[in-house]
Amino acid sequence: MIIKPKVRGFICTTTHPVGCEANVRRQIAYTQAKGPIENGPKKVLVIGASTGYGLASRIAAAFGAGAATIGVFFEKPGTETKTGTAGWYNAAAFDKAAKEAGLYAKSVNGDAFSNECRQQVIELIKQDLGQVDLVVYSLASPVRKLPDTGEVVRSALKPIGEVYTTTAIDTNKDQIISASVEPATEEEIQNTITVMGGQDWELWMSALRDAGVLADGAKSVAYSYIGTDLTWPIYWHGTLGRAKEDLDRAAAGIRGDLAAHGGTAHVAVLKSVVTQASSAIPVMPLYISMSFKIMKEKGIHEGCMEQVDRMMRTRLYGSDMALDDHARIRMDDWELRDDVQQTCRDLWPSITSENLSQLTDYSGYKQEFLRLFGFGLDGVDYDADVNPDVQFDVVTL
């Protein structure tokens, strides 16, 4: 079939397998061009490995450090008449490239919140790798089914305490609007912590430890975002911030556990990037469009791949992790530079529908958004007939 993008709200309902592969190959080429990651990981588990920062982590580990990788994700394959999720095609493309390079790669497609998934992964590690020396936790899900009770808990992206009203982009109409979000109830706050906090990361690390599949000196990293005062009401001071604070709590406990065997665990705070997750948060598309323009002009722009590659080379496996007061790795250091943030603050009040394209990199935002789904990549013939049914070596639960 010939596949074109169909965008509804903050989701693209079609995906392009060849475009997704081109996107993965582009990221692989970036890491390879940087040369080997010295003293990098050798056996890596990535939980949430099919898109965004998780996919970038798997690529950096495999193609930067030559690591064997196991990736866990929850994606839908395509059929002859319907496209699968972008993450499915990304994972398939990664698997293909890894096999071509002679690298071990296995994938598990299932609910990473479930005990069954943990058990399957542990068996795979025991059977093929023995132990892992890096665990990357990069899940972004709005819903979590609790493993013991089966209860389904939903998160809420909301402010706390009062209504949040802000300037935002209506991405369907490319217009500046005023958006208001009602504050979260106490139950919504707790639910968001349950879904997006550190509890599941702890369950994974405990299960891996108890099964004896964590190598001495093993490291673990979970990803977070803090942002700036421009986004704090909806993010860091909202329900998401509470969940991310819980991630810090979990990190301290996991760090204590791993330290006994020479290992460590940290939250890595990353910069804002275009992902399916960030495009769902009011204010983020506008903020990202602004910060992209400013950071590109200053030559310090990074996407997921650039961020993770720099983190692995200079921090996680570098000479100095440069941790903050909460023992977090700060990869948002360039975005939070005073010159970048002050320019954002100055710009914010003056943006209108008419000057949106001139004052921000909204066109770059939209291009990046479509790339997530495999569209708008150089060298891909989008008028060609492609088969959406792509198969690869994956254990499906």
Swiss-Prot record:
InterPro entries named among the record's database cross-references: Eno_Rdtase_FAD-bd_dom, Enoyl-CoA_Rdtase_cat_dom, FabV-like_NADH_b, Trans-2-enoyl-CoA_reductase
Binding site for substrate: Y225
Documented EC number(s): 1.3.1.9
Domain of life: Bacteria
Keywords: Fatty acid biosynthesis, Fatty acid metabolism, Lipid biosynthesis, Lipid metabolism, NAD, Oxidoreductase
Catalytic activity: a 2,3-saturated acyl-[ACP] + NAD(+) = a (2E)-enoyl-[ACP] + NADH + H(+)
Residues at the active site: Y235 (proton donor)
Site feature: Plays an important role in discriminating NADH against NADPH: E75
Keyword DNA-binding recorded: no
Associated pathway: Lipid metabolism; fatty acid biosynthesis
Matching HAMAP family: FabV_reductase
This protein's name: Enoyl-[acyl-carrier-protein] reductase [NADH]
Species, as recorded: Edwardsiella ictaluri (strain 93-146)
